[in-house]
Amino acid sequence: MLWLFQSLLFVFCFGPGNVVSQSSLTPLMVNGILGESVTLPLEFPAGEKVNFITWLFNETSLAFIVPHETKSPEIHVTNPKQGKRLNFTQSYSLQLSNLKMEDTGSYRAQISTKTSAKLSSYTLRILRQLRNIQVTNHSQLFQNMTCELHLTCSVEDADDNVSFRWEALGNTLSSQPNLTVSWDPRISSEQDYTCIAENAVSNLSFSVSAQKLCEDVKIQYTDTKMILFMVSGICIVFGFIILLLLVLRKRRDSLSLSTQRTQGPAESARNLEYVSVSPTNNTVYASVTHSNRETEIWTPRENDTITIYSTINHSKESKPTFSRATALDNVV
Protein backbone atom coordinates (compact mmCIF):
# COMPACT_ATOMS: atom_id res chain seq x y z
CA MET A 1 0.00 0.00 0.00
CA LEU A 2 3.07 2.23 0.15
CA TRP A 3 2.83 3.06 -3.57
CA LEU A 4 -0.78 4.16 -3.16
CA PHE A 5 0.05 6.40 -0.22
CA GLN A 6 2.94 7.98 -2.10
CA SER A 7 0.79 8.53 -5.15
CA LEU A 8 -1.89 10.28 -3.14
CA LEU A 9 0.76 12.31 -1.33
CA PHE A 10 2.14 13.40 -4.71
CA VAL A 11 -1.25 14.50 -5.95
CA PHE A 12 -2.03 16.56 -2.87
CA CYS A 13 1.43 18.02 -2.32
CA PHE A 14 2.07 19.27 -5.84
CA GLY A 15 -0.74 21.66 -6.55
CA PRO A 16 -1.05 24.28 -9.30
CA GLY A 17 1.65 26.44 -7.66
CA ASN A 18 4.28 23.72 -7.55
CA VAL A 19 4.00 22.16 -11.03
CA VAL A 20 3.77 23.46 -14.55
CA SER A 21 0.14 24.10 -15.35
CA GLN A 22 -1.58 21.97 -18.00
CA SER A 23 -2.75 24.99 -19.97
CA SER A 24 0.81 26.20 -20.52
CA LEU A 25 1.99 22.88 -21.93
CA THR A 26 1.81 21.78 -25.54
CA PRO A 27 1.02 18.04 -25.61
CA LEU A 28 3.25 15.89 -27.75
CA MET A 29 1.21 14.39 -30.59
CA VAL A 30 1.92 10.67 -30.96
CA ASN A 31 0.38 8.53 -33.68
CA GLY A 32 -0.14 4.82 -33.21
CA ILE A 33 -1.18 2.17 -35.74
CA LEU A 34 -4.17 0.03 -34.88
CA GLY A 35 -3.03 -3.40 -33.68
CA GLU A 36 0.62 -2.39 -33.31
CA SER A 37 2.70 -0.80 -30.51
CA VAL A 38 3.58 2.76 -29.54
CA THR A 39 6.03 4.36 -27.09
CA LEU A 40 5.46 7.58 -25.14
CA PRO A 41 8.98 8.95 -24.46
CA LEU A 42 9.85 10.25 -20.99
CA GLU A 43 12.73 12.60 -20.08
CA PHE A 44 14.14 12.85 -16.56
CA PRO A 45 15.36 16.04 -14.85
CA ALA A 46 19.12 16.20 -15.13
CA GLY A 47 21.10 15.67 -11.90
CA GLU A 48 18.07 15.02 -9.72
CA LYS A 49 16.93 11.90 -7.95
CA VAL A 50 13.46 10.74 -8.92
CA ASN A 51 11.22 9.72 -6.08
CA PHE A 52 8.29 8.30 -8.07
CA ILE A 53 6.53 8.50 -11.41
CA THR A 54 2.81 8.46 -12.06
CA TRP A 55 1.29 7.75 -15.48
CA LEU A 56 -2.25 9.02 -16.11
CA PHE A 57 -4.69 8.25 -18.92
CA ASN A 58 -7.54 10.75 -19.36
CA GLU A 59 -6.88 11.98 -15.79
CA THR A 60 -7.17 8.43 -14.42
CA SER A 61 -4.21 6.68 -12.78
CA LEU A 62 -2.61 4.19 -15.13
CA ALA A 63 0.58 3.15 -13.30
CA PHE A 64 2.74 4.15 -10.33
CA ILE A 65 6.52 3.57 -10.43
CA VAL A 66 9.09 3.84 -7.60
CA PRO A 67 12.65 3.75 -8.95
CA HIS A 68 15.51 2.14 -6.97
CA GLU A 69 19.23 2.52 -7.53
CA THR A 70 20.21 -0.93 -6.25
CA LYS A 71 17.25 -3.06 -7.30
CA SER A 72 14.47 -3.27 -9.85
CA PRO A 73 11.87 -0.51 -9.71
CA GLU A 74 8.49 -1.07 -8.17
CA ILE A 75 5.84 -0.90 -10.89
CA HIS A 76 2.18 -0.92 -9.91
CA VAL A 77 -0.40 -0.92 -12.70
CA THR A 78 -3.60 0.69 -11.50
CA ASN A 79 -5.71 0.25 -14.67
CA PRO A 80 -6.61 -3.44 -15.16
CA LYS A 81 -8.04 -2.87 -18.67
CA GLN A 82 -4.64 -1.93 -20.07
CA GLY A 83 -2.49 -3.78 -17.55
CA LYS A 84 -1.53 -6.73 -19.79
CA ARG A 85 -0.63 -4.42 -22.66
CA LEU A 86 1.53 -2.01 -20.63
CA ASN A 87 5.32 -2.09 -20.47
CA PHE A 88 8.06 0.34 -19.42
CA THR A 89 11.54 0.95 -20.76
CA GLN A 90 14.64 1.53 -18.64
CA SER A 91 13.90 5.25 -18.78
CA TYR A 92 10.31 4.53 -17.66
CA SER A 93 8.84 5.51 -21.00
CA LEU A 94 5.39 3.99 -21.50
CA GLN A 95 4.96 1.24 -24.11
CA LEU A 96 1.45 0.22 -25.11
CA SER A 97 1.04 -2.84 -27.35
CA ASN A 98 -1.83 -4.23 -29.43
CA LEU A 99 -3.33 -0.79 -29.78
CA LYS A 100 -7.08 -0.36 -29.84
CA MET A 101 -9.21 2.55 -30.88
CA GLU A 102 -10.21 3.14 -27.24
CA ASP A 103 -6.56 3.84 -26.40
CA THR A 104 -6.94 7.21 -28.10
CA GLY A 105 -6.76 10.05 -25.61
CA SER A 106 -4.64 12.17 -23.31
CA TYR A 107 -1.66 10.74 -21.38
CA ARG A 108 0.43 12.43 -18.70
CA ALA A 109 3.58 11.49 -16.82
CA GLN A 110 4.21 13.20 -13.46
CA ILE A 111 7.83 12.94 -12.28
CA SER A 112 8.48 13.84 -8.64
CA THR A 113 11.89 14.75 -7.23
CA LYS A 114 12.91 16.19 -3.87
CA THR A 115 12.88 19.75 -5.15
CA SER A 116 10.54 19.85 -8.13
CA ALA A 117 7.97 18.10 -10.24
CA LYS A 118 7.84 17.69 -13.99
CA LEU A 119 4.72 17.09 -16.05
CA SER A 120 4.88 15.62 -19.57
CA SER A 121 1.72 15.54 -21.68
CA TYR A 122 0.89 13.45 -24.75
CA THR A 123 -2.01 13.10 -27.14
CA LEU A 124 -2.25 9.63 -28.63
CA ARG A 125 -4.13 9.01 -31.87
CA ILE A 126 -4.84 5.51 -33.10
CA LEU A 127 -4.98 5.30 -36.88
CA ARG A 128 -5.65 2.51 -39.31
CA GLN A 129 -3.05 1.45 -41.82
CA LEU A 130 -4.45 2.41 -45.20
CA ARG A 131 -5.17 -0.43 -47.57
CA ASN A 132 -7.05 -1.36 -50.70
CA ILE A 133 -7.05 1.92 -52.57
CA GLN A 134 -9.44 2.00 -55.51
CA VAL A 135 -10.36 4.41 -58.29
CA THR A 136 -13.78 4.24 -59.90
CA ASN A 137 -14.57 6.13 -63.06
CA HIS A 138 -17.61 7.26 -64.98
CA SER A 139 -16.57 8.33 -68.46
CA GLN A 140 -18.59 9.97 -71.20
CA LEU A 141 -17.73 10.32 -74.89
CA PHE A 142 -19.18 13.29 -76.75
CA GLN A 143 -19.87 13.58 -80.46
CA ASN A 144 -16.76 15.72 -80.98
CA MET A 145 -14.76 12.74 -79.58
CA THR A 146 -13.89 14.64 -76.38
CA CYS A 147 -13.76 12.29 -73.40
CA GLU A 148 -14.93 13.50 -69.99
CA LEU A 149 -13.65 11.52 -66.99
CA HIS A 150 -15.27 11.49 -63.55
CA LEU A 151 -12.80 9.84 -61.15
CA THR A 152 -13.42 8.90 -57.50
CA CYS A 153 -10.69 7.66 -55.15
CA SER A 154 -11.40 5.62 -52.00
CA VAL A 155 -9.73 3.37 -49.43
CA GLU A 156 -11.05 0.67 -47.15
CA ASP A 157 -12.39 1.86 -43.76
CA ALA A 158 -11.65 5.52 -44.44
CA ASP A 159 -12.20 8.03 -41.63
CA ASP A 160 -11.76 11.75 -41.05
CA ASN A 161 -7.99 11.34 -40.66
CA VAL A 162 -7.59 10.25 -44.30
CA SER A 163 -6.82 12.91 -46.90
CA PHE A 164 -6.95 12.58 -50.68
CA ARG A 165 -5.36 14.50 -53.52
CA TRP A 166 -5.02 14.12 -57.28
CA GLU A 167 -1.78 14.81 -59.11
CA ALA A 168 -0.65 14.91 -62.73
CA LEU A 169 2.92 15.58 -63.83
CA GLY A 170 3.82 16.50 -60.26
CA ASN A 171 1.10 19.15 -59.99
CA THR A 172 -1.78 18.91 -57.54
CA LEU A 173 -5.09 19.10 -59.39
CA SER A 174 -7.48 18.55 -56.51
CA SER A 175 -7.41 18.00 -52.74
CA GLN A 176 -10.64 16.02 -52.84
CA PRO A 177 -11.33 12.34 -53.58
CA ASN A 178 -13.26 13.35 -56.73
CA LEU A 179 -11.77 14.66 -59.96
CA THR A 180 -13.40 15.64 -63.27
CA VAL A 181 -11.24 16.22 -66.35
CA SER A 182 -11.78 16.48 -70.10
CA TRP A 183 -9.36 14.78 -72.45
CA ASP A 184 -9.19 15.28 -76.21
CA PRO A 185 -7.01 12.69 -77.97
CA ARG A 186 -6.58 14.99 -80.98
CA ILE A 187 -4.75 17.69 -79.04
CA SER A 188 -3.65 15.95 -75.82
CA SER A 189 -0.88 13.44 -75.30
CA GLU A 190 -1.19 10.39 -73.08
CA GLN A 191 -1.91 11.55 -69.54
CA ASP A 192 -1.80 9.70 -66.20
CA TYR A 193 -3.72 10.87 -63.15
CA THR A 194 -2.56 9.73 -59.70
CA CYS A 195 -4.67 9.57 -56.55
CA ILE A 196 -2.76 9.77 -53.26
CA ALA A 197 -4.48 8.75 -50.03
CA GLU A 198 -2.63 9.29 -46.76
CA ASN A 199 -2.93 9.64 -43.04
CA ALA A 200 -0.32 10.20 -40.34
CA VAL A 201 0.95 6.61 -40.41
CA SER A 202 0.63 5.43 -44.03
CA ASN A 203 -0.04 6.47 -47.61
CA LEU A 204 -1.17 4.79 -50.82
CA SER A 205 -1.32 5.86 -54.45
CA PHE A 206 -3.09 4.69 -57.58
CA SER A 207 -2.66 5.89 -61.18
CA VAL A 208 -5.04 5.71 -64.12
CA SER A 209 -4.47 6.42 -67.81
CA ALA A 210 -6.85 8.84 -69.49
CA GLN A 211 -6.13 7.30 -72.88
CA LYS A 212 -6.93 3.78 -71.65
CA LEU A 213 -10.17 4.86 -69.97
CA CYS A 214 -11.33 6.79 -73.03
CA GLU A 215 -10.50 3.90 -75.36
CA ASP A 216 -12.67 1.62 -73.23
CA VAL A 217 -15.50 4.14 -73.41
CA LYS A 218 -15.08 4.40 -77.19
CA ILE A 219 -15.28 0.61 -77.54
CA GLN A 220 -18.42 0.51 -75.41
CA TYR A 221 -19.90 3.37 -77.43
CA THR A 222 -19.11 1.59 -80.71
CA ASP A 223 -20.56 -1.70 -79.47
CA THR A 224 -23.71 0.02 -78.27
CA LYS A 225 -24.07 1.87 -81.57
CA MET A 226 -23.61 -1.36 -83.53
CA ILE A 227 -26.20 -3.16 -81.42
CA LEU A 228 -28.70 -0.34 -81.93
CA PHE A 229 -28.00 -0.37 -85.68
CA MET A 230 -28.57 -4.14 -85.88
CA VAL A 231 -31.78 -3.95 -83.86
CA SER A 232 -33.04 -1.10 -86.03
CA GLY A 233 -32.20 -3.05 -89.20
CA ILE A 234 -34.03 -6.15 -87.97
CA CYS A 235 -37.08 -4.07 -87.07
CA ILE A 236 -37.08 -2.45 -90.53
CA VAL A 237 -36.85 -5.85 -92.29
CA PHE A 238 -39.68 -7.31 -90.22
CA GLY A 239 -41.78 -4.20 -90.83
CA PHE A 240 -41.19 -4.44 -94.59
CA ILE A 241 -42.18 -8.14 -94.61
CA ILE A 242 -45.37 -7.45 -92.67
CA LEU A 243 -46.23 -4.53 -94.98
CA LEU A 244 -45.61 -6.70 -98.07
CA LEU A 245 -47.87 -9.45 -96.74
CA LEU A 246 -50.63 -6.93 -96.05
CA VAL A 247 -50.34 -5.48 -99.57
CA LEU A 248 -50.47 -8.94 -101.18
CA ARG A 249 -53.49 -9.90 -99.14
CA LYS A 250 -55.29 -6.68 -99.99
CA ARG A 251 -54.52 -7.14 -103.68
CA ARG A 252 -55.83 -10.71 -103.65
CA ASP A 253 -59.06 -9.59 -101.99
CA SER A 254 -59.44 -6.80 -104.57
CA LEU A 255 -59.02 -9.22 -107.51
CA SER A 256 -61.61 -11.58 -106.09
CA LEU A 257 -64.12 -8.77 -105.61
CA SER A 258 -63.46 -7.42 -109.12
CA THR A 259 -64.10 -10.85 -110.70
CA GLN A 260 -67.45 -11.10 -108.99
CA ARG A 261 -68.48 -7.64 -110.16
CA THR A 262 -67.59 -8.29 -113.84
CA GLN A 263 -70.12 -11.13 -114.17
CA GLY A 264 -73.38 -9.57 -115.57
CA PRO A 265 -76.95 -10.71 -114.96
CA ALA A 266 -77.14 -12.53 -118.33
CA GLU A 267 -74.00 -14.55 -117.56
CA SER A 268 -75.30 -15.32 -114.12
CA ALA A 269 -78.57 -16.49 -115.66
CA ARG A 270 -76.70 -18.68 -118.15
CA ASN A 271 -74.76 -20.19 -115.33
CA LEU A 272 -78.00 -21.34 -113.77
CA GLU A 273 -79.83 -24.46 -114.95
CA TYR A 274 -83.36 -24.97 -113.83
CA VAL A 275 -84.98 -28.33 -113.44
CA SER A 276 -88.73 -28.54 -113.10
CA VAL A 277 -90.33 -31.52 -111.45
CA SER A 278 -94.11 -31.61 -111.12
CA PRO A 279 -95.27 -34.43 -108.90
CA THR A 280 -99.06 -34.31 -109.04
CA ASN A 281 -100.01 -30.62 -108.67
CA ASN A 282 -96.80 -29.21 -107.02
CA THR A 283 -93.84 -27.75 -108.85
CA VAL A 284 -90.29 -27.82 -107.41
CA TYR A 285 -87.48 -25.77 -108.91
CA ALA A 286 -83.80 -26.56 -108.45
CA SER A 287 -80.93 -24.41 -109.64
CA VAL A 288 -77.29 -25.36 -110.24
CA THR A 289 -74.68 -22.67 -110.65
CA HIS A 290 -71.71 -23.21 -112.93
CA SER A 291 -69.27 -20.51 -111.96
CA ASN A 292 -66.96 -19.09 -114.62
CA ARG A 293 -68.22 -21.61 -117.20
CA GLU A 294 -67.95 -20.56 -120.79
CA THR A 295 -71.42 -20.63 -122.39
CA GLU A 296 -72.12 -20.34 -126.04
CA ILE A 297 -75.31 -18.69 -127.25
CA TRP A 298 -77.19 -21.19 -129.35
CA THR A 299 -78.37 -19.90 -132.68
CA PRO A 300 -80.93 -21.96 -134.54
CA ARG A 301 -80.22 -22.85 -138.14
CA GLU A 302 -82.66 -23.38 -141.01
CA ASN A 303 -82.20 -27.11 -141.37
CA ASP A 304 -82.13 -27.80 -137.63
CA THR A 305 -84.91 -29.92 -136.37
CA ILE A 306 -86.63 -28.63 -133.27
CA THR A 307 -87.68 -31.31 -130.87
CA ILE A 308 -89.87 -30.62 -127.89
CA TYR A 309 -90.31 -33.16 -125.19
CA SER A 310 -93.42 -33.06 -123.09
CA THR A 311 -93.29 -33.38 -119.37
CA ILE A 312 -94.24 -36.83 -118.17
CA ASN A 313 -96.91 -36.85 -115.56
CA HIS A 314 -96.70 -39.77 -113.21
CA SER A 315 -100.38 -39.72 -112.41
CA LYS A 316 -102.56 -42.58 -113.57
CA GLU A 317 -104.50 -40.42 -115.99
CA SER A 318 -103.66 -41.02 -119.60
CA LYS A 319 -102.50 -38.05 -121.61
CA PRO A 320 -103.25 -37.74 -125.32
CA THR A 321 -100.25 -38.12 -127.58
CA PHE A 322 -99.81 -35.35 -130.08
CA SER A 323 -98.21 -35.84 -133.39
CA ARG A 324 -95.04 -34.05 -134.41
CA ALA A 325 -96.90 -31.75 -136.77
CA THR A 326 -99.42 -30.75 -134.12
CA ALA A 327 -96.65 -29.97 -131.70
CA LEU A 328 -94.98 -27.81 -134.26
CA ASP A 329 -98.22 -25.95 -134.84
CA ASN A 330 -98.53 -25.25 -131.16
CA VAL A 331 -95.05 -23.85 -131.01
CA VAL A 332 -95.69 -21.53 -133.92
UniProtKB/Swiss-Prot annotation:
This is SLAM family member 6. The lineage of its organism: Eukaryota, Metazoa, Chordata, Craniata, Vertebrata. The chain crosses the membrane at residues 227-247. It is a single-pass type I membrane protein. The gene is SLAMF6. Residues 35-120 form the Ig-like V-type domain. Residues 132-209 form the Ig-like C2-type domain. It is found in: Cell membrane. Coiled coil: none annotated. Expressed by all (resting and activated) natural killer cells (NK), T- and B-lymphocytes. Increased surface expression on T-cells of systemic lupus erythematosus (SLE) patients. The ITSMs (immunoreceptor tyrosine-based switch motifs) with the consensus sequence T-X-Y-X-X-[VI] present in SLAM family receptors have overlapping specificity for activating and inhibitory SH2 domain-containingbinding partners. Especially they mediate the with the SH2 domain of SH2D1A and SH2D1B. A 'two-out-of-three-pronged' mechanism is proposed involving threonine (position -2), phosphorylated tyrosine (position 0) and valine/isoleucine (position +3). It comes from Homo sapiens.
